[in-house]
């Protein structure tokens, strides 16, 4: 899993274990993990997709401003929504429960904003992408909802759901990138890196 010597170092602007794991799947090991501490509050009437891409860009730019050496910075932000309603990154049992009730028996969308910045010779090259995945949960009983919430795996996740966990047992339909729902669309990430001269293969 060694990077090509001629590649610039990769800096991941996130401490998310899922994003680290996803990069490792395509044989990329970040040389640094620098979480970007930004205000993730949506603007008034801000829609889910614009929110995701804005936050990803703000994360990438913040980390780029802290890095002196040439590098490639990868940042992402994942937003779940039912229609135009943005679901929170649930932090409490009640928030997880409310989110799961919202998506029970219906389709919802997961957006990941991807922003990759190449900083070299005091110049920034920015690549941005918004990726959407449609996910449908079966109609859940109160018992199933309570059981899922008791697992505590949805805390800190967009929409209160960890797709790579027990929630997979509830998903009846998915259209689009699975890795996107986990937090980093790998196809788009690899393409963006390649366009910046990074040898993924």
Curated annotation (Swiss-Prot):
For this chain, one GO molecular function annotation is:
nucleoside triphosphate diphosphatase activity
One GO term (biological process): nucleotide metabolic process
A cellular component term, taken from the record's GO annotations: cytoplasm
Q: Chief subcellular site?
A: cytoplasm
Q: According to its UniProt record, where is this protein located?
A: Cytoplasm
Enzyme Commission no? 3.6.1.9
> Transmembrane residues, as ranges?
none
Q: Name one Pfam family in it.
A: Maf
What is the enzyme's class at the highest EC level? hydrolase
Locate the coiled-coil region(s) and give their ranges: none
Q: Report the catalytic activity.
A: a ribonucleoside 5'-triphosphate + H2O = a ribonucleoside 5'-phosphate + diphosphate + H(+); a 2'-deoxyribonucleoside 5'-triphosphate + H2O = a 2'-deoxyribonucleoside 5'-phosphate + diphosphate + H(+)
The similarity comment for this entry is: Belongs to the Maf family.
Q: What does this protein do?
A: Nucleoside triphosphate pyrophosphatase. May have a dual role in cell division arrest and in preventing the incorporation of modified nucleotides into cellular nucleic acids.
The protein's name is Nucleoside triphosphate pyrophosphatase
Organism expressing this protein natively: Rickettsia akari (strain Hartford)
Q: What is the lineage of its organism?
A: Bacteria, Pseudomonadati, Pseudomonadota, Alphaproteobacteria, Rickettsiales
């Amino acid at each position: 899993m060694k990077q090509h010597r001629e590649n610039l170092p990769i800096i991941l602007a996130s401490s998310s274990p899922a994003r680290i794991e996803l990069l490792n799947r395509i044989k990329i090991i970040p040389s640094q993990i620098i979480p970007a501490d930004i205000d993730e509050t949506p603007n008034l009437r801000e829609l889910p997709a614009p929110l995701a891409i804005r936050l990803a860009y703000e994360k990438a730019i913040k980390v780029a401003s802290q890095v002196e050496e040439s590098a490639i910075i990868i940042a992402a932000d994942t937003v779940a929504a039912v229609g135009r309603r943005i679901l929170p990154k649930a932090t409490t049992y009640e928030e997880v429960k409310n989110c799961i009730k919202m998506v029970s028996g219906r389709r919802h969308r997961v957006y990941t904003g991807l922003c990759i910045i190449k900083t070299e010779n005091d110049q920034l090259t920015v690549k941005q992408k918004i990726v959407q995945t449609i996910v449908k949960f079966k109609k859940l009983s109160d018992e199933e909802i309570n059981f899922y919430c008791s697992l505590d795996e949805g805390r800190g996740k967009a929409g209160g759901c960890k797709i790579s966990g027990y929630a997979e047992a509830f998903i009846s339909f998915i259209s689009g990138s699975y890795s996107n729902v986990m937090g980093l669309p790998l196809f788009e990430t690899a393409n963006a890196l390649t366009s910046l001269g990074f040898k993924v293969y």
